[in-house]
Each structure stands twice: as C-alpha cells, then as structure tokens.
A protein has these predicted regions:
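Acidic/histidine-rich catalytic neighborhood of metal-dependent amide-processing enzymes
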Residues: 118-135
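Acidic/His- and Gly-rich active-site-bordering loop/insert found
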Residues: 2-115, 133-134
Length: 135
C-alpha cells in the first residue's frame, strides 16, 4: 500500500506551474476564432507530447477549432483502465483583450482572462499527470 505521506514529498514547483499557466493564458483562444483555438491546441499538444503523450488532433467542425486527444501509455499495458481528463481551452474573450486586461502575476497569484476557466484547471491536470508519470 502506498505511503499516505508520499504525496507531500512530490516535487511540485509553483513557479514552473505558474509559468506554464502564464504561457497558456497569454495564448488568446476565443471560441469562434478557429486559428486562435488551434494555436492554443498547438501549445497544449506540445506540452503533453513532452510528457510522453500520443497526440491525436481531431479537426474542428462548423468553423470551430480543433480538439486534442492525448493518450499516455499505461504501465500495465494496453487495455488497462485509465484516467479520463476532459477540459476546454477556449475562452469567451476576443483577440485583443490582453492589450486592455493583461495577464499578470503577483506573488503566487495570477490574474487575467483564461487564468481560472479553464486554462488554470487544465494546467493543474497536466501537472498532476506529470507527477503520476514521475512517481
């Protein structure tokens, strides 16, 4: 049985997590701008691939941006049950919003469009996956 205190020993680096969050939030990705959403999908795909994920790009339909499916190899092999994480990385803010409302970091807090919904949660999910892989 795993040690209950092992989670406390994981090397979470707040600065690294916040740096990824700031990069992702700086990539404006309004829902109805397929090119902008695809740039965000490129960024997320790169980060996930660097963790060892197999990336499948699913073309958007009806003028919308693409989706990304990232699959990580299971230590028990193919067919073993896994973990499903779903998220969106588009925002409601139009291109140019960051000129008027820039993202910013103040200590351990970040502010701006996309920081919480939903890029922040997705960055944390990616970090959790990184920790699972490293464990």
């Amino acid at each position: 049985m795993p040690d209950a205190t092992a989670a406390l020993k994981l090397p979470f680096e707040a600065d690294d997590i916040l740096a990824r969050l700031m990069r992702w939030a700086a990539c404006e990705s309004p829902t109805f701008d397929a090119g902008a959403v695809n740039r965000m999908m490129d960024l997320a795909s790169r980060d996930l691939a660097l963790l060892g994920a197999r990336i499948d790009r699913i073309p958007g339909r009806m003028g919308l941006g693409d989706c990304v499916r990232a699959r990580f190899p299971h230590p028990a092999g193919d067919g073993a049950p896994g973990i499903l994480v779903m998220a969106h990385l588009d925002t409601v803010h139009p291109i140019g919003t960051l000129e008027k409302l820039p993202i910013r970091r103040e200590g351990n807090r970040c502010y701006g469009p996309g920081i919480l919904d939903m890029k922040g949660g997705t960055v944390l999910a990616v970090e959790a996956m990184r920790q699972i892989i490293a464990a």
